[in-house]
Curated annotation (Swiss-Prot):
InterPro entries, per the entry: PRC_barrel-like_sf, PRC_RimM, RimM, RimM_N, RimM_N_sf, Transl_B-barrel_sf
Keywords: Chaperone, Cytoplasm, Ribosome biogenesis, rRNA processing
Keyword Nucleus part of the UniProt annotation: no
Protein name according to UniProt: Ribosome maturation factor RimM
Cross-referenced Gene3D superfamilies: PRC-barrel domain, RimM
Domain PRC barrel: 95-169
Quaternary structure and interacting proteins, as annotated: Binds ribosomal protein uS19.
Biological process terms in GO annotation: ribosomal small subunit biogenesis; rRNA processing
Single GO cellular component term: ribosome
Family recorded in the similarity comment: Belongs to the RimM family.
Cell compartment(s), UniProt: Cytoplasm
Function of the protein: An accessory protein needed during the final step in the assembly of 30S ribosomal subunit, possibly for assembly of the head region. Essential for efficient processing of 16S rRNA. May be needed both before and after RbfA during the maturation of 16S rRNA. It has affinity for free ribosomal 30S subunits but not for 70S ribosomes.
SUPFAM superfamilies recorded: PRC-barrel domain (SSF50346), Translation proteins (SSF50447)
Source organism of this protein record: Lactobacillus johnsonii (strain CNCM I-12250 / La1 / NCC 533)
C-alpha cells in the first residue's frame, strides 16, 4: 500500500483559467511543483492524481495550473485540499539529509555522555535553520537548533540522534 506525504495546500482559485494558489509545506517546492510532477489530493479517503501543467512563484505562494483543471469552477472544487506526494515519487536525498518522517520520534542522546535526553517530537521551520522539539521522559520539552554545533549525528539505520547541548538550551528546573 502506497504511503502519501503532505507537501502543500491548495488555498484558492487564481484567475478564471483554472490556476490555484498553493502554500507549499515542503523543503523542495520547485521539485514538487515542477511541470509534469504527479501530486495527489484526497477525496472521500481516495487519493486522486493531479499532474502539474505549469507553476510560477507569486509572493510567498505558488500559482499552479493542473492538467484537466481548466476553469474557475473546476479550480474551486479542489480548493482547501492538501496536496500529497506518493512515497514512490520521493527522491533519494543527498548524504546528511533526511525526511522529517524518518527522524520524528527518534531517541535523542547527549553525544558526550550517552545520556538519553528524550525523543524528537516536533520539527519547526521558522527561518534559516529548523528547530527540533525534544520531549524528555520527565519534565518540560525543549527546543534545539538543527545546526552543526548542536546536532552531531543522525543515524537513520539505528534510529538514533546525538547532540551537544549549548548552555541554556535546556531548562533543568
Amino acid at each position: 500500500m502506497t504511503e502519501y506525504f503532505e507537501v502543500g495546500k491548495i488555498l484558492s482559485p487564481h484567475g478564471l483559467k483554472g490556476e490555484v494558489k498553493v502554500n507549499a509545506t515542503t523543503d523542495f517546492p520547485e521539485e514538487r511543483l515542477a511541470t509534469g510532477s504527479r501530486l495527489f489530493i484526497k477525496n472521500n479517503k481516495q487519493y486522486e492524481e493531479l499532474i502539474v501543467e505549469n507553476t510560477r512563484r507569486h509572493k510567498q505562494f505558488y500559482l499552479v495550473k493542473f492538467e484537466k483543471i481548466d476553469d474557475i469552477d473546476q479550480a474551486e472544487k479542489i480548493c482547501s485540499k492538501e496536496l500529497y506526494v506518493a512515497e514512490t515519487d520521493q527522491q533519494e536525498l543527498p548524504e546528511g539529509s533526511y525526511y522529517f518522517k524518518d527522524i520524528l520520534n527518534c531517541p535523542v542522546y547527549d553525544a558526550e555522555t550517552g545520556e538519553k535526553l528524550g525523543v524528537l517530537e516536533n520539527i519547526e521551520t521558522p527561518g534559516a535553520n529548523d528547530i527540533w522539539e525534544i520531549k524528555p521522559e520527565k519534565g518540560k520539552s525543549f527546543w534545539i537548533p538543527n545546526i552543526e554545533s548542536v546536532v552531531k549525528k543522525v543515524d537513520l539505520a539505528n534510529k538514533r540522534i546525538e547532540v551537544t547541548l549549548l548552555e541554556g538550551l535546556r531548562d533543568e528546573n
